[in-house]
């Protein structure tokens, strides 16, 4: 744009005479005519003159604000809808655990000594139709139980504390396996 601003009619319908840039008493760098068709001034940017009315820019600004507001409301509605659908999906699921098909239960709390940790000790389980004596295993060598006077090496006793794996089935007509103490003093082969 040039440094000469031509005369124009302002937004208040007043005629403003033309002037040249820079204006007397203004900045020396403001050598270009800037602004709009109804509002002109001097500035230092050669690309700041717009050939339409200043009020048009206000309508553009208001339109942009309305458009951004509508977009924000739509985005907010989408986020709220997604959150509600996720909540309904999660809350409508049943709160029951999955049935694995096995009915294993622990026989009771048994403490494992530090010497037995890291070896195959197994876990006792209750099996229907099996006597409690068959389910528990005393972890003691039967020969040592009968000879009370004999000194017992506790580490050696605990190393023979093994239990066979128990599996049961709810399928009608299938044989059930029961927990049976391992007669081998070294325990089952892993």
From Swiss-Prot:
Keywords: Membrane, Transmembrane, Transmembrane helix
Location in or out of the cell: Membrane
Location, primary (coarse class): membrane
Protein origin, superkingdom: Eukaryota
Parts of the chain that traverse the membrane: 48-68, 70-90
Pfam families: Shisa_N (PF13908)
CC annotations in GO: membrane
UniProt keyword Transmembrane, yes or no: yes
UniProt membrane topology term: Multi-pass membrane protein
Family listed: Belongs to the shisa family.
Protein name: Protein shisa-like-2A
The organism of origin for this protein: Homo sapiens
Gene: SHISAL2A
């Amino acid at each position: 744009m040039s440094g000469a601003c031509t005369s124009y009619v302002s937004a208040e319908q007043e005629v403003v005479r033309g002037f040249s840039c820079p204006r007397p008493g203004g900045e020396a760098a403001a050598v270009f005519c800037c602004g709009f068709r109804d509002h002109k001034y001097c500035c230092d940017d050669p690309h700041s003159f717009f050939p339409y009315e200043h009020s048009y820019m206000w309508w553009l600004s208001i339109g942009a604000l309305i458009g951004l507001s509508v977009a924000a409301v739509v985005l907010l509605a989408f986020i709220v809808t997604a959150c509600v659908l996720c909540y309904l999906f999660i809350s409508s699921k049943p709160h029951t655990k999955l049935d694995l098909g096995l009915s294993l239960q622990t026989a009771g709390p048994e403490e494992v000594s530090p010497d037995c940790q890291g070896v195959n000790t197994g876990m006792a389980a209750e099996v229907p139709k099996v006597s409690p004596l068959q389910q528990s295993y005393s972890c003691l060598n039967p020969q040592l139980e009968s000879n009370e006077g004999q000194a017992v090496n506790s580490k050696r006793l605990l190393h023979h504390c093994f239990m066979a794996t128990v599996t049961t089935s709810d399928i009608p007509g299938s044989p059930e396996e029961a927990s049976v103490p391992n007669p081998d003093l070294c325990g089952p082969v892993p």
